[in-house]
């Protein structure tokens, strides 16, 4: 393809007084007589390549079909050189392409890539813009606000004041991508479980387990609750109630004895329970264990508030060496009985 006519021959042709359009027309007529009926395929291939619809590789594959004909390379190179010369002279791609004889376009198109439909749409847009700009500032602002897109998800108004404890979605302190719907259902089941103040009785093992599971999930413990946890809590609750009643009996021991002397059938009534809680309202509070109570008995009342637990007995409480073994045996026996 690179062999053939040189640039000097093209320049000599233009220096003889011939116009560039006349020279390129003669070359194209020679190419048409050479190719015959295949000239239309050649013109379509070159036009598509010049406007960017064909790549260089595709163009070369199409032109290889005409390479066997004599003088084809010379005429093809002459056409390319004249096109480049016109482009450099006019410095306008579109005007150079319009000099090609086979390049026919409609007069309504102002440029190479401008279609009639696009030009009509641009004219309609310019007309609408002229009408809008002729309006007042307030009207233009109203049109601008009307054309704004609305948010996809409207903002939710918090209804915390209207929600109940059961209706609210429970909050679990874990990331949302790890949230399981089973956890939410377990927490709701714990909320629905009846309270002891509502049933006026000790909770059963199943309802207590549901409440323990809900509280553990709210605090981030997602591993579940073991089977015997609710039974141990019920046993501790019964022991605590037993200690409260024992405390009430010790308070009203004298009153109960007087009733027994007057009436052999006398027992523990609601009035006695009310009297015991009136005398000592802190009877519901669990007492200190035996080991924590001992240091308070071993110190005087004028000591400081912050008292450390004595690991060993004070020196003034120690007996003589002769009776030390007997006292230690008695102390160990008392510890076993009190525990």
Swiss-Prot record:
GO biological process: regulation of transcription by RNA polymerase II; transcription initiation-coupled chromatin remodeling
Pfam family, one: SAGA-Tad1
InterPro entries with a match to the protein in the record: Hfi1/Tada1 (IPR024738)
GO cellular component: nucleus; SAGA complex
Subcellular location as annotated: Nucleus
GO function term, MF aspect, one: transcription coactivator activity
Intrachain S-S bonds: none
Keywords: Nucleus, Transcription, Transcription regulation
CDD domains named in the record: HFD_HFI1
Summary of subunit composition and partner proteins: Component of the 1.8 MDa SAGA (Spt-Ada-Gcn5 acetyltransferase) complex, which is composed of 19 subunits tra1, spt7, taf5, ngg1/ada3, sgf73, spt20, spt8, taf12, taf6, hfi1/ada1, ubp8, gcn5, ada2, spt3, sgf29, taf10, taf9, sgf11 and sus1.
Family indicated by similarity: Belongs to the HFI1 family.
Record function comment: Component of the transcription coactivator SAGA complex. SAGA acts as a general cofactor required for essentially all RNA polymerase II transcription. At the promoters, SAGA is required for transcription pre-initiation complex (PIC) recruitment. It influences RNA polymerase II transcriptional activity through different activities such as TBP interaction (via core/TAF module) and promoter selectivity, interaction with transcription activators (via Tra1/SPT module), and chromatin modification through histone acetylation (via HAT module) and deubiquitination (via DUB module).
Protein name listed in UniProt: SAGA complex subunit Hfi1
């Amino acid at each position: 393809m690179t062999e053939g006519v040189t640039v000097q021959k093209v320049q000599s042709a233009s220096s003889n007084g011939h116009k560039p359009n006349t020279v390129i027309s003669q070359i194209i007529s020679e190419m048409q007589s050479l190719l015959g009926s295949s000239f239309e395929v050649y013109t379509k291939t070159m036009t598509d390549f010049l406007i960017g619809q064909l790549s260089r590789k595709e163009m070369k594959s199409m032109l290889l079909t005409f390479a066997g004909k004599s003088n084809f390379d010379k005429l093809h190179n002459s056409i390319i050189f004249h096109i480049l010369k016109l482009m450099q002279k006019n410095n306008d791609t579109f005007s150079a392409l319009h000099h090609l004889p086979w390049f026919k376009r409609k007069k309504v198109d102002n440029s190479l890539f401008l279609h009639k439909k696009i030009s009509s749409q641009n004219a309609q847009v310019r007309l609408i813009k002229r009408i809008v700009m002729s309006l007042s500032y307030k009207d233009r602002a109203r049109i601008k606000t009307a054309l704004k897109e609305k948010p996809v998800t409207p903002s939710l108004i918090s209804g915390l004041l209207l929600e109940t404890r059961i209706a609210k979605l429970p909050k679990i302190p874990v990331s949302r991508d790890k949230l399981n719907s089973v956890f939410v259902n377990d927490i709701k089941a714990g909320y629905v479980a009846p309270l002891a103040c509502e049933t006026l009785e000790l909770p059963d093992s199943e309802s207590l387990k549901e409440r323990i599971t809900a509280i553990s999930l709210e605090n981030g413990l997602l591993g579940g609750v073991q089977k015997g946890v609710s039974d141990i809590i019920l046993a501790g609750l019964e022991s605590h109630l037993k200690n409260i009643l024992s405390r009430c009996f010790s308070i009203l021991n004298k009153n109960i004895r007087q009733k027994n002397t007057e009436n052999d059938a006398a027992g523990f009534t609601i009035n006695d329970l009310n009297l015991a809680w009136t005398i000592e309202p802190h009877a519901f509070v669990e007492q200190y264990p035996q080991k924590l109570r001992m240091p308070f008995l071993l110190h005087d009342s004028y000591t400081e508030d912050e008292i450390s637990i004595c690991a060993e007995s004070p020196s003034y409480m120690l007996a003589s060496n002769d009776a030390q073994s007997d006292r230690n045996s008695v102390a160990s026996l008392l510890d076993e009985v009190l525990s």
